[in-house]
Amino acid sequence: MAENQYYGTGRRKSSAARVFIKPGNGNIVINQRSLEQYFGRETARMVVRQPLELVDMVEKLDLYITVKGGGISGQAGAIRHGITRALMEYDESLRGELRKAGFVTRDARQVERKKVGLRKARRRPQFSKR
């Protein structure tokens, strides 16, 4: 690919995204599909665009993204994290603005495991007094 390309890895829940950024006109390709084709939900598309809108680069950069694992929400979060990291590699002066918006920090929340004797992670079986 091009030599003036920047890379960022993003993770969220069980999803991992690899994001490549290069100067262009705003094309976003995710797993060989457009953003609109890949994410049916508008909220997921919005999450993906957030870091670009924050730094006014929506129409200035082309994004090539591969993402694996998890569901729609996790993948969107992973892509956002990856875009943020790639933007920081592209221009380090954007770090402060992105940090303030909370995009730089990896969201460490994971699904809590189911425990033996319980129905779910914390849901206990119904208690009967008599």
UniProtKB/Swiss-Prot annotation:
Annotated membrane-spanning segments are none
The record's GO CC annotations read: cytosolic small ribosomal subunit
Q: What Pfam families would the database entry show?
A: Ribosomal_S9
PROSITE patterns in the record, alphabetically?
RIBOSOMAL_S9
Q: Which UniProt keywords apply?
A: Ribonucleoprotein, Ribosomal protein
Q: What is this protein called?
A: Small ribosomal subunit protein uS9
State the family named in the UniProt similarity comment for this chain: Belongs to the universal ribosomal protein uS9 family.
Give me any GO biological process, just one: translation
> Which lineage is the organism of this entry classified under, starting from the top rank?
Bacteria, Pseudomonadati, Pseudomonadota, Gammaproteobacteria, Enterobacterales
Q: What GO molecular function annotation could you give as one example from this UniProt entry?
A: RNA binding
**Protein's UniProt keywords contain NADP:** no
Give the matching InterPro entries: Ribosomal_Su5_D2-typ_SF, Ribosomal_uS9, Ribosomal_uS9_bac/plastid, Ribosomal_uS9_CS, Ribsml_uS5_D2-typ_fold_subgr
Query: Per its UniProt entry, which superkingdom is the organism in?
Result: Bacteria
Does the keyword section mention Ribosomal protein? yes
